[in-house]
Amino acid sequence: IAVLQGQSWPRFWRRWAQVVGCAALVSLGSWWMFPHSWISFGVLHGMALMLLMVRWLLVRGWLRGATPWVLGLGAVLAAPLLSALLQSHGSPALGAALQSRWWNWLGVVTEKPPTEDWVPLLPWLGVMLWGAGAAQWWWQRRTSRAVRTAGAAERALALLGRWSLSYYMLHQPVLIGLLMAFRALSAAH
């Protein structure tokens, strides 16, 4: 929708830099807490890469009509198909390379990598492409009813949407803190 509304490149890059910065903080924090299973390609890392890819495709007009739906389906199906092919016919060296932290972000693996969060390019690029397709579909069919004055619930949801990265970055420390407090209280009794 941002592309359809004419979001400028400087505004896109500013938001993208925020996502990348938060992804780096997640990696550093998880490395500190979980040195053997730190997050090298989680939700924010995946979003940063996929935002670049999808925006690039959108501004070139390559995601029109059924294209994002078809490409999305291809990306969703590619991960399990390529992983099965790798497991049955791939070389052990290629399998080990794709399983490594340096390449597992592609999503062509035979087992889940040892990490606390993992959102690989395949299949998740497909889901983001479906989101781009859904946004375009909605944009083309919006009516005057869709631009009416928002009610209280809609304004609250819009506020959450505008600050979603902040909420995302706060939810893990809050949840971990609550779990640690619960554990400490449980151990005391």
Per-segment meaning from a language model:
Residues 1-189:
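Alpha-helical transmembrane segments and their immediate juxtamembrane cytosolic regions
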